[in-house]
Amino acid sequence: GALNRRPDWEPLMPAINEAIRRYGDRLYFRVISDHGFYEELRTEAKAFAGGMRDASIVAPYEHYTAALHASDIALLPLRDTEFNRAKSDLKFIESAGHGAVALASPTVYAGTVRDGETGLIYHSPEEFAEKLDLLIQRADLRRTLAENAYRYVAEHRLLDQHLDEYIAAYREMFARREEFEQDRRRRVEEFFPKL
């Protein structure tokens, strides 16, 4: 879950509600912080933690990770927008670390999720519906994808495996701090000329 994601998930809601209609009690939803998403689910088999429609309250992180850990599937929809393309793949990393299979959009996640190996990528609401159906029906596939994703994170994405890269990046930023500050000031003047 996240706040203000209606444009990302709204095109998928008919497929989600159709899965609810087809599978009934086999499905249980844990929604974090997005009350709009929670309200659109046509089932009573759902739980909500944190977040209000106006985004004034955010669920504690431990509620988010507990929900991931208790889930089989994590829905990771992001429309292809400039804002979303600037996001990281952290939700995939968190999902994989807690054993939930990612059903993700290609925006952000296509660079990390290996479709059919460490999760599933969809390119349309129709493909989302097909892949959601597949994940619901196939416990063996969910288990294999979750294990592969967990192994990928353990082998490639832990912080201690990249410390030298992080240190080098921070040293470079520190060395270029005056250049960055000049760029920042130029952007402030451009976007806020009366400031």
Model regions: which residues?
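C-terminal amphipathic helix plus adjacent low-complexity
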Residues: 150-156, 160-195
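Glycosyltransferase donor-binding loop in the core domain
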Residues: 3-4, 87, 120, 154
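Nucleotide-sugar-dependent
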Residues: 7, 58-68, 72-97, 103-113
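Conserved catalytic-core segment of nucleotide-activated headgroup transferases in glycan assembly
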Residues: 1-70
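Conserved acidic donor-binding segment of nucleotide-sugar-dependent glycosyltransferases
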Residues: 115-126, 134-140
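Short amphipathic alpha-helix
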Residues: 15, 91-92, 166
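Hydrophobic alpha-helical packing elements
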Residues: 128-131, 141, 145, 158-166
